[in-house]
């Protein structure tokens, strides 16, 4: 059995992965902000990718703060399901 390839990923997973990859490599604040905003719409599935983005060395400090605030919003507005 081989590893997971792109065809096996759902459209949602592919979009999340694409947004994360684009934002982690971007020096443009608008690109990073847009990716974080879109990932926020995925609720708790967006938390890990946003964390990966704000840990990237090329991401500006203001965008790191923006990402942390986005994670806080997700945690506040996403119902807890044990």
What are these regions (language model features)?
Residues 7-23, 44-55, 76-82:
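Amphipathic alpha-helical scaffolding segments comprising HEAT/armadillo-like alpha-solenoid repeats
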Residues 1-11, 30-44, 62-79:
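Structural detector for internal amphipathic alpha-helices that build alpha-solenoid repeat scaffolds
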Residues 27-28, 58-60:
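Short inter-helical turns and helix N-cap capping residues of alpha-solenoid HEAT/ARM repeat scaffolds
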Residues 39, 54-57:
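Generic structural signal for hydrophobic core residues of well-folded globular domains
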């Amino acid at each position: 059995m081989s590893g997971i390839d792109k065809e096996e990923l759902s459209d949602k997973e592919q979009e999340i992965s694409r947004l994360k990859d684009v934002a982690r490599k971007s020096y443009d604040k608008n690109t990073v902000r847009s990716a974080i905003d879109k990932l926020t719409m995925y609720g708790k599935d967006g938390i890990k990718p946003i964390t990966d983005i704000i840990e990237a060395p090329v991401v500006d400090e203001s965008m790191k703060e923006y990402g942390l605030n986005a994670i806080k919003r997700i945690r506040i507005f996403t119902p807890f399901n044990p």
